[in-house]
Amino acid sequence: MRPSAIARFSSRRVERTACLAAGVFLLASGFIASALAQSAQQSQPDSGQNSQNSAQNPAQTPQKPAPVTTTVIVHGEVEDNYLPESITVGTLGGVPLKDAPLSASVMTRDLMSDQVSRLLSDVVKNDASVDDDYVPVGYYGVYEIRGFPIDLATGLEVNGLPIAGEQDVPLENKEAVEILKGIASVESGVANAGGLIDYVTKRPANIHAVDLATDQRGTAFGAADFGQLFGSQKQVGARFNLAGERIVPYMNSTNGWRAVGAGAADWKLSPKAVLRGDFEYQHKTERDGSGYQLLGGTTLPDINHIYRSTMLGDQPWGPPDTYDTFNTSARFNYALSPNWTAFAAAGLSHSLIQDNVLYVYGCYYEAECNSGAAPPYFFAPDGTYDIYDYRDPGELRIDGQAEAMLSGHIRTGVITQDVTAGGVLFLRTVHQPGAPPGDAPSTVQDGAVYSYVGSANIYQPIAALPPPGDPDSLEYPLQSAGPRALWEDDHQASAVIEDRVRIPGRIQLIAGGRYDSLRDHNYSLTATSPSTPPKISDKNPWLPQYAVTFDPKRSLTLYANYGVLLSLGPEGPFWVDNSSQFLAPFFTRQAEIGAKYEPSGRILLTTALFHMRAPFFYPKVIEAPDSFCPESVFVAPGDLCFQQEGRETHNGIELNAAGKAANWLRLNASATAMSAMSTDTGTPAFDNRQVINVPRLHSNVFADLTVPGVRGLHLMPGWSYTSRKEATRDDAVSVPSYNLLNLGARYTPGGEQGRVTFHIYANNVTNKKYWSDTGASYGDTFIWLGAPATVRLDAHYSF
């Protein structure tokens, strides 16, 4: 947790854009249809375009869809395109992606390899509905889907089980990354709206491969992928992934390194029973950089006079962050009969962080800000900012989940039903530094260390500051954090049920829901002020989810869905009267209609129209005590109080194309046009305004083009466009729109069946300088410079 979130230590014309996006999509669809027609006229079978993934897994054959799952899962082979040929994605029972009544995208292993992806931020850029929210260099990221930040407690999964999202999940052992866009109340229970991101691990196969990679800055990467199938019927398999990396980012002084170890095992105990297990561990150490803030809360820094390579507040004595994380799970599938199956699964996720950063924030120690002439929670008007020694040792977050499901197929005349029911138990705990004991020395702080050590200016060189503990330092004597204490204890017990009814006329009706018994104990205030009682959220909501699908023909699916989701209330920032207090849980509702078209079995075209509504939260100027800031916390008229008032409504259209458009073209394209408006907020300046950090239009295209006449050579151009993003709630300040061009190539000497494959991929080839994001974190807003041109090289060898 970063200090801006911590109160106690002292101190965020859709019609035209939709038409434009639709026009782009129609043009792309026309081009794809033309390419498909040309491909269909060719008499030769497509035998020379096997993907890298197929070369890596010669003995692996497409598997049957996994049985019932409580989360949206995608499993299967990737053969010759960016769309898995055999996949399951759905509500509780799992259905083919084309038939699923929801909006989802899949980033395959081929796509990740072609783009030389290392982090989730490299992957999610392929979906226009996903944006960065708070993603510092060297720190784990927070992302938003459809304009809503994901919940790090439950919004990230591995093989359908939630993990502690405060980590950079390694990609070396991942077969795919799936993104579910929109509400998934049956799957996720109590969480934030927007969607889920799920990592699918590689399964055992006969494979022996190594990778070596670098970039123009000197990053060094190596990985090994070893797998083997055993037994007369190959009923037992194991796979191991090892990786190490010396990390050299574009920002000075943020170098680091990481090591990864992962294993997976499958055991077919009998024709009816299968046991699967996974484990992954990563150790990472790296310094991270802070983002910029608006000058005086009203002005963007002059982008022509700042540098992407500058680490704000950099000092040679600044320690790095250290991460030790593991995720493990097991799953047992059993076929009770030809029509009935059951499974049980359990997972545990552990994230331990030694959080150390030279944190750059606000201008509390500048005269202009202290006088009230400028808000102290932004940079000063002249670009001056405060530097804090922030140390939060022993941040420990644990997620655990166990679930069991029973699924059956029932036929009654012309009506068939797929019924699924089961239960889920979820636990999350958070430990961080708390209040010192009564006999502790005065150097032990209440919670994390958050000490002012000096100031600097974004337009000037950073002066050297004495390290904490030095007699000349503003932090003398050296401070230490309080002992680790329990901050959050979240228990959920859920009963889930779903019935998918197929009736004549190619119509399917789906009704389901999740009864969730939530008991969330938040001790964040108690941990640092023991006399303060914990914040307890005790809810027992019924979270319904309904859908209908209609298939006019085999290749086309039309659908509609409706769902409700419960989320825990946000925490007030430290500079409001009700600082660090959590607001009440709230509901988000969604209605969505969509269409999916798969004309050839090799490419999927989808579109979705969605409407989502949630409460609006913001710091409001108040003149007298109210229900959010009663007499006990109200300080003075004109103060700010963090409140829930009004609502934000997100309406949008999503367009996607993924797969193989022709023998010479693989494609992954996405466009999202969205209006995310705040209304009835009680502050007229904030009404009918676009929500912070949500672009009205976002699009991207990535293509893999076979070069004629050069066997094994492919060119991979890419382009993305992001419209302007608002940086203030009144939309008075925004960052400009930008285009980015990417370019890559893949070469396999001797053709696609060769053992060696070389990749080169360059992001932002024009080295464009731009503001990428304006995300809000715990009520504070930050602006981030986009990354400069980065060229990555990778060599893959199979043996």
Report the location of each language-model feature.
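Conserved C-terminal beta-signal and adjacent last beta-strands/turns
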Residues: 23, 395, 407, 419, ...
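Acidic, small-polar-rich N-terminal luminal/periplasmic segments of exported/outer-membrane proteins
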Residues: 69-207, 593
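Acidic/polar loop-and-plug regions of large Gram-negative outer-membrane beta-barrel proteins
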Residues: 245-249, 262-268, 272-335, 339, ...
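Gram-negative outer-membrane beta-barrel transporters
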Residues: 504-509, 611-613, 639-728, 796-798
